[in-house]
Amino acid sequence: MLDLSNFFLTRPLANRFREVVSGSKDGAPKWAYQMLEGNDEGYFGPESAVWEVHGCVSTIIGGIRALLLQAAHPAALAGVAEHSRYESDPLGRLAGTTKWLTITSFGATEVIEKEARRVNEMHSKVIGNYQAKDGQAHNYAAQDPEYLMWVHCAFTDAFLQTYIQLGYKFKTDRKSTRLNSSHIPLSRMPSSA
């Protein structure tokens, strides 16, 4: 893989990108200090496929793929269209998703559970209805396990496939299987931010 980290244009672009994604001028938002809390490796740990894949730059491209796949579900699309700040504050929305993904991937269990409570509280208000292709009206709620599973599977598939398609290799042959089987019980799963 080509290393562009020392290319003269890379540093300012990287700095700006960190600011955009994190929501902080220095690329280190206040919430990042939560990552120092807790005394365990969270749900996954440093040897997991989650740490390997989510710690890779391919996650940025995978995130775009995930958003497109998530939007293919009419309930997810309606929820975002009616309740998200993606139009009025797209960078803030991106920073919120970055916070959620970082904490749930790399944080200690108590930090993940705190983030889950925050996001689940926010998403408890995300309810509404949408019209399906057949003209039928359907209700949705962001905390519905079916929709949560759709969103989480879209993230998993998008991050994993992008990682593989960009030519990254797992340190062991069994990691892709572990990524697919790594899960958080739905009762404790934080909604996607």
Range-by-range predicted roles:
Residues 1-178, 182, 193:
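Mature, function-bearing regions of proteins
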